[in-house]
């Protein structure tokens, strides 16, 4: 069961499995936990990532060029556990690779290798019932996305939410944004009003200032593109034996700077 403490709010980083290599992905996961991550989203690269912006698309292309697959990504979770990663790990994967592997086989393999949840961004809520049942059976919650929509739809999604609810901060694909919608606070408050599980916000979160603002209204902040871009910038240094340690330390320091506002004292609401 995925039980999350949300005081202070959760820092939920996202990285892509296999970018820049499987081995470095494990090292990055360790660095993120040491930097204060409460939960890790491990993105499974896919050739047609409809929900992802250019930064994560490029990372997926690099990982696919290195022959990363869904089964290999799942086995990376086991490697992370062997190396000492203890925080919950959520597999972020598109539906087609799950279908190819087999839905039940996917949940069984994920559970066997130490994953703690699943997020499938292109799975419509109306079609998610069978996978939610598999999630309950394997104690591997299917995390639901909820975007700005009608109160009735928010209530329906929240009523069956498992693990935590992932609020999409703005419509469109993932990617860093200079500003967040003014209506975001009201949207998150509406979701929290109906939710029995923690409510996290993602898509576009890329600065400590945005994190500081969001900690006042939600239970967790997901940061993806900013961290994936940092991996891209570090590039070959992460793969060079003589530079790898320093590059990972730089990545960890950047992650720590993004998470820092979550652990600062809250202002009065």
Swiss-Prot record:
What catalytic reaction does the record list? (1S,2R)-1-C-(indol-3-yl)glycerol 3-phosphate + L-serine = D-glyceraldehyde 3-phosphate + L-tryptophan + H2O
Gene Ontology cellular component list: cytosol
Pathway(s) per entry: Amino-acid biosynthesis; L-tryptophan biosynthesis; L-tryptophan from chorismate: step 5/5
What are the positions of the active site? 41 (proton acceptor), 52 (proton acceptor)
Kindly indicate whether the keyword Disulfide bond belongs to this entry: no
User: Any keyword Amino-acid biosynthesis?
Assistant: yes
Q: What is its EC number?
A: 4.2.1.20
Q: Pfam families attached here?
A: Trp_syntA
Keywords of the record: Amino-acid biosynthesis, Aromatic amino acid biosynthesis, Lyase, Tryptophan biosynthesis
GO molecular function, a single term: tryptophan synthase activity
The record's note on quaternary structure and interaction partners says: Tetramer of two alpha and two beta chains.
Homology family? Belongs to the TrpA family.
Identify the HAMAP family for this entry.
Answer: Trp_synth_alpha
Q: What does this protein do?
A: The alpha subunit is responsible for the aldol cleavage of indoleglycerol phosphate to indole and glyceraldehyde 3-phosphate.
Name under which the protein is recorded: Tryptophan synthase alpha chain
Q: Which organism's genome codes for this protein?
A: Geobacillus stearothermophilus
């Amino acid at each position: 069961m995925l039980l999350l403490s949300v005081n202070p709010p959760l820092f939920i980083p996202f990285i892509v499995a296999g970018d820049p290599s499987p081995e470095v992905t494990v090292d990055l996961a360790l660095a993120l936990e040491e930097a204060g991550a409460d939960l890790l989203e491990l993105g499974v690269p896919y050739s047609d990532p409809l929900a992802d912006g250019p930064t994560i698309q490029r990372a997926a292309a690099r990982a696919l060029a290195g022959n990363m697959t869904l089964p290999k990504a799942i086995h990376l979770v086991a490697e992370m556990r062997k190396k000492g990663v203890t925080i919950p790990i959520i597999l972020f994967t598109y539906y087609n690779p799950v279908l190819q592997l087999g839905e039940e086989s996917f949940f069984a393999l994920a559970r066997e290798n130490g994953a703690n949840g699943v997020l499938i961004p292109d799975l419509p809520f109306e079609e998610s019932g069978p996978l939610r049942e598999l999630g309950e059976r394997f104690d591997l919650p299917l995390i639901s996305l909820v975007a700005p929509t009608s109160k009735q739809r928010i209530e329906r999604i929240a009523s069956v939410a498992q693990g935590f609810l992932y609020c999409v901060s703005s419509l469109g694909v993932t990617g860093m944004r200079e500003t967040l919608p003014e209506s975001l606070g009201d949207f998150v408050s509406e979701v929290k009003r109906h939710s029995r599980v923690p409510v996290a916000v993602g898509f576009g979160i890329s600065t400590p200032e945005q994190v500081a603002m969001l900690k006042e209204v939600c239970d967790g902040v997901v940061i993806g593109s900013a961290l994936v871009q940092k991996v891209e910038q570090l590039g070959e240094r992460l793969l060079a034996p003589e530079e790898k340690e320093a590059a990972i330390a730089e990545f960890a320091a950047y992650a720590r700077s993004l998470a820092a506002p979550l652990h600062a004292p809250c202002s009065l609401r």
